[in-house]
Amino acid sequence: MSKTSKAYRAAAAKVDRTNLYTPLQAAKLAKETSSTKQDATVEVAIRLGVDPRKADQMVRGTVNLPHGTGKTARVAVFAVGEKADAAVAAGADVVGSDDLIERIQGGWLEFDAAIAAPDQMAKVGRIARVLGPRGLMPNPKTGTVTADVAKAVADIKGGKINFRVDKQANLHFVIGKASFDEKLLAENYGAAIDEVLRLKPSSSKGRYLKKITVSTTTGPGIPVDPSITRNFAGE
């Protein structure tokens, strides 16, 4: 939705920019301000009090949302033999090795997450420059380089999300769809915030959660009170 459109302006008028909403209030308002006919994705943006240029202040992690994302992720798996068979059985959308790498080198990127068996990483490194900037490069820290590829596929299909701080110290992640009940959105939000807090670098000084905004992909940003770190689904 264009920020100059009549529908967007009407939605934005419902948001009090001077107010800090509870996660539950923000989830409810996000649903109300989504005017698209499609089931919009609900997203969270966080400004962190870290310096991403410092290696010891890189915030990166994964979390299994208790109520899923509302979207079935398309998963690519780099594996051969029994691991490839296990990935297929677990529901992977595409499984391969050299053939899959060549396909990606040719421009194919129709997947949302990538998993690799450890013995495939030397090969996958050939497409790191393609996958890395898109947040698709398998990494042991996010559980996407693993011998148990079947579990990794099941986790991602079940609502596991990844997040990583960008160069501007922002985090972005999905907590569900506008069709979700606001309480479920708030509980997903809480699960993600819990993990972000757990990953706070010891070298980070001052306020860690500086600014939090909830919105749908087409709606206005709704400011959330960053001091709320428990009872996320409460009024």
UniProtKB/Swiss-Prot annotation:
Pfam family membership, one: Ribosomal_L1
Highest taxon of the lineage: Bacteria
Coiled-coil regions listed: none
Cellular component annotations (GO), alphabetically ordered: large ribosomal subunit
InterPro entries per the UniProt record, alphabetical: Ribosom_uL1_bac-type (IPR005878), Ribosomal_uL1 (IPR002143), Ribosomal_uL1-like (IPR023674), Ribosomal_uL1/biogenesis (IPR028364), Ribosomal_uL1_3-a/b-sand (IPR016095), Ribosomal_uL1_CS (IPR023673)
Keyword terms of this UniProt record: Repressor, Ribonucleoprotein, Ribosomal protein, RNA-binding, rRNA-binding, Translation regulation, tRNA-binding
GO-annotated biological processes: regulation of translation; translation
Molecular function, one GO term: structural constituent of ribosome
Alphabetical list of Gene3D superfamilies matching this protein: 3.30.190.20, 3.40.50.790
Role description: Binds directly to 23S rRNA. The L1 stalk is quite mobile in the ribosome, and is involved in E site tRNA release.
NCBIfam families attached to this UniProt entry: rplA_bact
Family label: Belongs to the universal ribosomal protein uL1 family.
Subunit structure and binding partners: Part of the 50S ribosomal subunit.
The protein's name: Large ribosomal subunit protein uL1
Organism the protein comes from: Mycobacterium bovis (strain ATCC BAA-935 / AF2122/97)
Native organism taxonomy: Bacteria, Bacillati, Actinomycetota, Actinomycetes, Mycobacteriales
